[in-house]
Amino acid sequence: MSGEEKLGKLRAKLKEITEQIDDADQKKVEAKHALVDSLARLEKNEVEVNSAKRRIKLIEKDLEDSSERLKVAEEKLIKVEAEEKKIEEARNLLEEAESADDEKMYNIEEEFKESKRTLESNETKYIEAQRKGVVISRDVEKTRDKADTLEKRVAVLEQTIASAGESLVELEEREGESSEREEINEEKLIFLAGQFKESEVRAEAAERSCNVLERNIFETENEINTWIQKRKEIEDEMIEMDTVADEPDDE
C-alpha cells in the first residue's frame, strides 16, 4: 500500500475520530444541559417537595385546627340542642299555661256572669224585701190601731160589767123594800142579768180578738225582723261581690 493510501486512511480515520469527538463533545454538552436541566428540575422538585411539605404541615395544622373547631362546634351543637330542648319544654309549658289561662279566664268570665246574675237577683230580692217591709210595717200599724181600739172596747165593756154588777147589788139590796116594785125589779134584774151576760160574752170575744191581734203583731214583728236580717245579708253579699269585682287579677 502506498503512502497516499495510508494517509488517506489516516485522514479518514482522523475525520471519523474528529467526528466522534465532536459527537462526544456534543453529547457531553447535551449531557451537561441535561444534567443542568435535571439539577434544575431536581431543585425545582425539592422546592416543590419542601413547598408540599409546608403545605402538608399547614394542612395538618388546619386539620388539627379543624378538628378542634369541629370539637368546639360539636360541644356548641350539644349546648344548642340542650337549649332547644329547654326552649321546646318552655314553649310547651307556655302553651299549657296559656291554655290554663284561657280556661281560667273562661271560668272567671262565667263566674263574673253568674255573680252578675246573682247580684241582679239579689237586687230584685232586696227591692222586694223593702216593698214587703213597707207593706208589713203598714199592716203592723193597722194591727196596732185595731188592738188599741179593741183594748178601749174591752175597757168600756169591763166598765159596763162593773156598772151592771153594781146595779145587781143595788137591786138585791132593794128587793125587800117594796112588794109593789118586786115585779118591776125582777124584770130589771133579768134585763140587767142579760146585759151582764152579753157584756161578758163581748168581753171574752174582745179578749180573744186582742189575743189574736197580739199574736199577729208578734208574728208580723218576727217576719219584719226576718226580712231585715235577709236584707242585711243581701246587702253584705252585694258589697262582697262589688269588692271582688273591683279587685285586679294578679295572675
From Swiss-Prot:
InterPro entries: Tropomyosin. Pfam families: Tropomyosin (PF00261). Residues 1-251 form a coiled coil. The keyword Coiled coil applies. The molecule is in a coiled coil structure that is formed by 2 polypeptide chains. The sequence exhibits a prominent seven-residues periodicity. PANTHER family: TROPOMYOSIN. This is Tropomyosin-2. Striated muscle specific. The keyword Cytoplasm does not apply. Homodimer. Keywords: Coiled coil, Repeat. Belongs to the tropomyosin family.
